[in-house]
Amino acid sequence: MMRFLTSLVLGAALLAGAAQAQNQPLRITIDEGIIEPLPYAAPNFVPDSPAAAEYAAEIARVLAADLTGSGLFREIPSTAYISQVTSFDAPVQFADWKAINAQALITGAVSVSGNRLTVRFRLWDVFAGAELGSGLQFAGTTDGWRRMSHKVADAVYSRITGESGYFDSRVAFVSESGPKDQRRKRLAIMDYDGANVQYLTDSSSIVLAPRFSPTGDRVLYTSYQGGFPRIHILDVGQVQQRVLQSQDGTMSFAPRFSPDGQTVLFSLAQGGNTDLYAMNIASGQSTRLTSAPSIETAPSYAPDGSRIVFESDRSGTPQLYVMSAAGGEATRISFGQGRYGTPVWSPRGDLIAFTKQSKGRFHIGVMRADGSEERLLTASFLDEGPTWSPNGRVIMFTRETQGASGRAALYSVDISGRNLRPVRTPDGGSDPSWSPLQK
């Protein structure tokens, strides 16, 4: 695990351009409206030696990809630069950056000693002609240079939006390869942007629905090893797994951790009925939460652990319901035209994301916990299985193409419905689960 040394003293908020008064802070407010991306420049970081040169260029590249990929920032290409940054401590030529309308400037330096790498950076308010603080430093191994890029991007994002970033995070997903009728599915994990893919299982059995723990060190998933679906739990660091729930004559699936990581919600099918259960991981004891003749599945906790949202067909079609985490009476919250499923609570607690099937199309949507303010963010032949970014501002999901190949791929979209983007994976991908920010 890479160890980070951090020191940060940030000053006044980033200020707007020439047309804005210097005592008014610039802040990107993320809402449902149209956002004009903030123009910024991120020149290659300055290396202290030839050994650091490649890292310096790559760190700036990944940093820019993070910020621009969020849809909130617009990178000014290096071909437009008037000034070049050749020294970390050289005075900034603010007039040159103003001339190309760079409202923010990010400069940095990279040093390498053996397998140790140190990154320093500064965030500048170009139009105010001021440095925002005394600098930030991350240190780790050369193998962890991408994480340091994401850390810098998170710091910039947080400073300008006032909210935490999401770049230094990972995604567990199901890697899919082979023809549609002989699809091989493996559990995999990667950086949020598709880099550093690691396969955690082979393709000897089908795997489904991976779900990260609140600490990001464990993953729940469903495996058909042995012929029946069983819930497994895997330690990501050790790549060690064990069966968490196994009972003859039953099928268990759709697992989800509680916010404290001590309990697992899941669906259990037995005797022709499917209900929700909660298992204490330490003791292995399970408590039945529902007892209806309908199918209850896809449960998800509220961030405070007090309530559960889930999918049920008790009304005749799949709809969304909310109930106490201890079970009891459930309240229906979905009333639009169509079928609803795969609900998941935002880490902010304000929204629930879901899959909706209506009029021959599939959608990813969001609504309030009481079912109000429903909004559909996407529409396609098949969109399903949303998962939230750590800051609750972006949703990743599975999109499957129509046709004989039926290739599944991962996409992301922000909660305003803007910035729909594919997430690159080596093969097809489905069932994403976003981790919390890494420590």
Swiss-Prot record:
Q: Which SUPFAM superfamilies match?
A: TolB, N-terminal domain, Tricorn protease N-terminal domain
Indicate where this protein resides in the cell.
Answer: Periplasm
Q: Kindly state a single biological-process term from the GO annotations of this entry.
A: protein import
Q: Name one Pfam family in it.
A: TolB_N
Region annotated Disordered, chain positions:
420-439
Q: Which residues form the signal peptide?
A: 1-21
Report one GO cellular component. periplasmic space
The record's InterPro entries line, in alphabetical order, gives: 6-blade_b-propeller_TolB-like, PD40, Tol-Pal_TolB, TolB_N
The alphabetical list of record keywords is: Cell cycle, Cell division, Periplasm, Signal
Domain of life of the native organism: Bacteria
UniProt record similarity statement: Belongs to the TolB family.
Q: PANTHER family given for it?
A: PROTEIN TOLB, PROTEIN TOLB HOMOLOG
* Role summary: Part of the Tol-Pal system, which plays a role in outer membrane invagination during cell division and is important for maintaining outer membrane integrity.
Q: Could you describe the subunit structure of this protein?
A: The Tol-Pal system is composed of five core proteins: the inner membrane proteins TolA, TolQ and TolR, the periplasmic protein TolB and the outer membrane protein Pal. They form a network linking the inner and outer membranes and the peptidoglycan layer.
Q: What NCBIfam families does this protein map onto?
A: propeller_TolB
Record HAMAP family: TolB (MF_00671)
Name under which the protein is recorded: Tol-Pal system protein TolB
Organism field: Ruegeria pomeroyi (strain ATCC 700808 / DSM 15171 / DSS-3)
